[in-house]
Amino acid sequence: MIRNITLGKVNNIRKSIILNVLASISNLIPFIALAKIVETLFLNRGADSIDTSLLWKYFGIMAIFFLITFLLENLAAKYTYELGYKTSADGRIELADHIRKLPIGYISGKSSAEILDTLMNDFFKVETAVTHQLPQFISGICVAVLCSILFLIVNVKMGIATLIGLPISVLLLTLMQNFQKKIYLKTKKMRIKEEEDINEYLDAIKTLKAYNSLDDTLTKLEEDIDNSRDANIKSEKGVGSLTTIASMILRIGLPLMSLVGSYLFINGSLEIDTFLMFLFVGTRIFDPLELALVNYTGLQMASVSGERIINLLKAKPMSGNFDVNESNKIEIHDVSFSYKESKVIDNVSLDINENELTAFVGYSGSGKSTLIKLISRFYDPNEGTIKIGGVDLLTADPDKLMDKFSVVFQDVYLFKDTIYNNIKFGNENASKDEIMNAAKMAGAYDFIVKKDDGFDTMIGQGGATLSGGEKQRISIARAILKNAPIILLDEATSSLDPENELIIQEAISNLIKNKTVVVVAHKLRSVMGADKIVVLNKGKVEEVGKHEELIKNEGLYKDLWNYQEKSKEWKIVQ
């Protein structure tokens, strides 16, 4: 459990635990001194004089250890909080960096809400455990053990009476571990589902308005939120009731100790000083013990969160440490790939020559975009090999490999930042002149400078404040700025209006000069001049050749061409 909570770094918390244990022990000593003061006053109640020096000695001990406790608690708190927040912050950075190195296939298999829940809520649980729950739990247990030994040495009967509820409480909570874990996992699953639905509701708000489906979707969202609420209430009731029962059983020791002590004292079997020690010190151990029991439940939840974080950190990153060669020839040999059970690429072999334009065409679902993602190592093939410059992608250093690529997708993602910084994302070391020039080559400069803040204009998250054509041009500008030798274009103009399409086609022409280019084409006319056109059908290579050759073959490519030519005649009629 402790290993999960500390994310495998148990040694980091030792100092914090030791300081908290010392503070708890130090906090007990003034009450032992108080018991001795009361004993002295009680034993000398009929005497003519009392040894005040002895009383001052006990008062001095109380004052000194109250001060020591204060210093230890402050030192422990300072160290614990620094450690907890540092563990959480460093852990989030480590996990974010680790996610960057994971295959896209692994990440796409998880929802963004699930990963975000781990980065935020799971780390918050771990943070709370390290800063509060774990030190209090361990110091409470240590105090209980030390006091138990002391009590049993001083008086076995009183010791048993005081601590009789402790093993029962611990046994109860131990037996209910799986129940607590099951409840916590269920509530976490409901919360992730709720977060997913809220994100989907916000992302789809325009579509929902267009179809007047807001009420129906809101009703579904309300159901999910209500289910999450009910699961949390049920969890709190179940775990809370369990903790309350355990605390009640633990505190049975207090009245039982008083009852047994009174009986033994009346019968002369217990000295007054021993009875007073149990009354003063015995009552003090119940607070840290009860706090330990309460924290135990929280630690169980934090342990589950820590386990989720560790499991994500254990996810195997993309392998490879070999340098990539200067050659940019792409060789695909007997490659097959499946999304779960569905085979998308089936035994494809293909050579893509350096400094040539190769186009992938075919019906929707034929594997065009998937092949692009395999080349850029967003996914790894299930079978076969892909090489660039003779180096197998699986053995190439992932960061150095990605330096070879500039990728322009149909769906462009822009960051919530200025236009300038979004373009600079292509090359963080680029000068202002280089960024301006990239914008001009991408056909983006004119529309940028017309905006009130020009290049300093803030973009909404995902580029929400820009048109599709504007987003695409900024995407091409940062690809130009990166100046990678291999360009991958995934239907970059398929959803644009004619004016934007023409501008972006000119921008792409600037981007791909003297590069190795692979393009997924929706409109066949845009790739008529390609050096090589690869026709894909159901994940297999159907035809390969230039436009004129493929038309003469009268195969699938010609069928696609005829369909597109015929579609020009289509009109909306009523």
PLM region spans:
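An intracellular "coupling" helix at the cytosolic face of ABC transporter transmembrane type-1 domains
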Residues: 5-11, 104-105, 121-130, 134, ...
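Transmembrane helix-loop-helix hairpins at lipid-water interfaces of multipass membrane proteins
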Residues: 14-72, 153-157, 269-272
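Hydrophobic/aromatic residues in alpha-helical transmembrane segments
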Residues: 30-34, 76, 80, 95, ...
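Hydrophobic alpha-helical segments in the permease module
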Residues: 58-73, 166-170, 239-253, 272-294
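Short intracellular "coupling" helices and adjacent cytoplasmic loop segments at the cytosolic face
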Residues: 85, 93-117, 121-123, 197-220, ...
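Cytosolic ends of transmembrane helices, especially the final helix of ABC transmembrane type-1 domains
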Residues: 213, 237, 285-312
